[in-house]
Amino acid sequence: MVLELYLDLLSQPCRAIYIFAKKNNIPFQMHTVELRKGEHLSDAFARVNPMKRVPAMMDGGFTLCESVAILLYLAHKYKVPDHWYPQDLQARARVDEYLAWQHTGLRRSCLRALWHKVMFPVFLGEQIPPETLAATLAELDVNLQVLEDKFLQDKDFLVGPHISLADLVAITELMHPVGGGCPVFEGHPRLAAWYQRVEAAVGKDLFREAHEVILKVKDCPPADLIIKQKLMPRVLAMIQ
């Protein structure tokens, strides 16, 4: 049976999975679950993922619903090149270290930056107090500095000389605030150079394809009242 991926490329972990599968020629059928239409909250999607979140994966009768678990499953099943998730114990531990940190580090601040800068005022019609936005962007800059100083340092990629899952997960997170108009790479020259290397390693066409939705997010139409009422509680819980 064909591998099935339930994705919305508005979502940063969905973009990571999409790029990884495409780059490694993993055959899959994509089901687009449009978050801005609340499709992830439907009863039909709940049968795929009871937590009503994307991404989700079905491989025959086997289902996974967490992005890192999906990436590791694909890396193991399809025997992708070693640099993505190295066999070397310490190199693999470095990938694991980044993946463990990013959930409560970079992801939270990137998500909040996008929602506070664009999605609340443009999509949901809710203005964010300037002091809240300023605090969010300050938190983002702190985590960018951690990414640069702790994880990247002076290496070409986060783990060493080659791209890994850590880089892919990190760059798709950073494209959230980039899509929101945040000058993410200003003042972070090592991150700016790393971004260029990651884009080249992935392939510019694939990178742009995966990020087309997020780079146009500022132009999204406002949500209707019903969708806003459905989404607001989950959005507020997500960005706390």
Swiss-Prot record:
Residues 88-222 form the GST C-terminal domain. GO terms for cellular component: cytosol; nucleus. Glutathione binds at H40, R53, V54, E66, S67. In liver, highest expression found in central vein limiting plate hepatocytes. Also expressed in interlobular bile duct epithelial cells. In lung, expressed in club cells and ciliated cells of the bronchiolar epithelium and in type II alveolar cells of the lung parenchyma. Its EC number is 2.5.1.18. It is an enzyme of class 2 (transferase). This is Glutathione S-transferase theta-1.
